[in-house]
Design a protein with these regions (language model features):
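PLP-dependent enzyme catalytic core of the Aspartate aminotransferase-like
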Residues: 5-6, 207-264
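Conserved small-domain helix->loop->beta segment predominantly found in fold-type I
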Residues: 122-128, 145-197
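Active-site phosphate-binding strand-loop segment of PLP-dependent enzymes
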Residues: 1-49, 74
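Helix N-cap motif at beta-to-alpha junctions
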Residues: 197-202, 230-234
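Glycine-enriched alpha-helix->loop->beta-strand junction motifs that scaffold or abut catalytic
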Residues: 11, 62-66, 212-213
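Active-site C-terminal subdomain of aminotransferase-like
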Residues: 76-81, 86-156, 162
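Conserved active-site segment immediately N-terminal to the catalytic lysine
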Residues: 42, 46-48, 52, 58-87
């Protein structure tokens, strides 16, 4: 965070920051980043694709200018699901840089005026009609998430990721396993996934998939594991730790190439 603040120089007009660093899972203090940016006259927004649905957000309280995110991760919208945006009220009177008919005032939309009649809210930043099949799953997921409560989801997320890190520390950090944790240990500094590093991360990633575990590989040596609080149990996490151990004990990684041409 200090490096980011140091980069907020007089040459910077707009800062777009990740809420969570996608490799290691570090959670930025978005309130602090907003404050520091505004002190310097910088407009600031956040890409919250890796935090939405697992971390509470208070954009209006923080005064953040804008944010956006996908809904196919913790929001359970599935691949190709509709994305979302937040625009602070203080910007609602501004003209979107790319205005589209779906951002028009609904009452005049079909008058097809030559001049854009803004919807006067974050809706104005919509461009075209969203597809219903890409949006419907999000509605169902939101109902479940409201019932569970984002604070409860966050609490379980911290506990279950903490448990995963504990298992790796206790069982898998020494020889011959040599797994390490790239994710910050402090609760306030981590999001919903754990970055596990290993010199053979790519081959381990493939071995995990073959065993029914769905991780992500990120260069050069990170395996991302994301226990989704809504439906992943502590027993599931324990079983993943056993698989991480077994693929080393049984030499399973030797079955896989180190060729990294595949996209994960």
């Amino acid at each position: 965070e200090e490096d980011i603040i140091a980069a907020m120089t007089d040459e910077v007009q707009l800062a777009l920051l990740p809420s969570i660093y996608y490799k290691c899972g570090q959670l930025l203090d978005m309130g602090r980043m907003t404050e520091e940016a505004h002190k310097r006259g910088i407009i600031v927004g956040f890409d919250c694709s890796h935090s939405t649905g697992v971390v509470p957000h208070h954009f209006s309280k923080w005064g953040s200018d804008f944010a956006f995110w996908c809904n196919y991760k913790y929001m359970n919208g599935g691949p190709g699901s509709t994305g979302s945006i937040y625009v602070n009220k203080k910007h609602w009177d501004e003209m979107p840089g790319m205005a589209g008919w779906f951002g028009n005032n609904r009452s005049t939309m079909f008058e097809m005026r030559q001049k854009f009649d803004s919807a006067g809210s974050a809706t104005a930043w919509q461009i075209g009609t969203t597809t219903m099949l890409s949006t419907a799953p999000i509605e169902g997921s939101l109902r479940m998430m409201r019932e569970a409560g984002i604070e409860n989801i966050r609490e379980k997320s911290l506990k279950i990721t903490g448990y995963l890190m504990y298992l790796i520390d206790e069982m898998l950090s020494g020889e011959p396993y040599n797994y390490g944790i790239a994710t910050p240990r402090e609760d306030k500094r981590r999001g919903g996934h754990v970055g596990v590093f290993h010199k053979d991360a790519w081959r381990i990633n493939q071995a995990l998939v073959a065993k029914g575990v769905i991780p992500d590989y990120r260069p050069p040596n990170i395996i991302r594991l994301a226990p989704i609080p809504l439906y992943v149990s502590y027993h599931d996490v324990w079983k993943v730790a056993q698989v991480l151990k077994a693929i080393i004990d049984d030499g399973d990684i030797e079955k896989f190439s180190d060729d990294k041409s595949t996209v994960t």
